[in-house]
């Protein structure tokens, strides 16, 4: 499945790798007594509604917002099963529209990430085809994984 995608740099690279590993049939496990430390400069604990998301975005650096947005879109393009995309289309579109609207109104420089993604579509298509070749689980199993 490869390693971290070098085009990501940082932010969402772990999600991309986890997505590829799971679609290739690998499983992940929870070790309940494991301790992990992860410095997140703008993550909050507790509520996760739209207002909390806006407050967290205000605390993030431009580089973090840019990479997070760009890499989120690249992860979807590279990895999402088209069947699941169609099933979730209204929610995905609503989520992406809210995020795009926020950036358009308050953080336009972050939208450079969208431009970079559009410019990378040919490369992303090649990567997507490689990922699809390595898939061992179907869209239903992947959907169950996301639901858990």
Predicted features along the sequence, with ranges:
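Catalytic-site signature of metal-activated, phosphate-bearing donor transferases
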Residues: 14-15, 23, 58-59, 74, ...
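Hydrophobic transmembrane-helix microenvironments that flank and shape a buried ionizable site
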Residues: 10-13, 68, 93
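Conserved aromatic-histidine-acidic binding/catalytic patches
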Residues: 9, 60, 102
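Catalytic core of nucleotide-sugar-dependent glycosyltransferases
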Residues: 34, 38-84, 108-124
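Transmembrane helix irregularities
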Residues: 12, 21, 79-80, 101
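A short, conserved alpha-helix in the catalytic core of glycosyltransferases
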Residues: 1-42
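Non-catalytic, C-terminal membrane-associated alpha-helical segments of glycosyltransferases
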Residues: 81-148
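Glycine-rich loops and low-complexity Gly/Arg-rich segments
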Residues: 16, 53-57, 92-93
């Amino acid at each position: 499945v490869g390693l971290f995608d070098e085009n990501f740099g940082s932010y969402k690279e772990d999600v991309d790798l986890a997505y590829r590993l799971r679609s290739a049939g690998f499983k992940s496990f929870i070790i309940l007594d494991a301790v992990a430390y992860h410095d997140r400069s703008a993550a909050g604990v507790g509520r996760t509604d739209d207002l909390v998301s806006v407050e967290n975005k205000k605390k993030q650096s431009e580089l973090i917002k840019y990479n997070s947005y760009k890499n989120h879109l690249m992860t979807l393009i590279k990895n999402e099963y088209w069947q699941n995309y169609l099933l979730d289309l209204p929610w995905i579109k609503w989520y992406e529209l809210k995020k795009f609207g926020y950036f358009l109104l308050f953080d336009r420089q972050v939208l450079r990430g969208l431009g970079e993604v559009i410019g990378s579509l040919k490369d992303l298509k090649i990567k997507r085809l490689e990922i699809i070749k390595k898939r061992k689980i179907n869209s239903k199993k992947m959907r169950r994984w996301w639901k858990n």
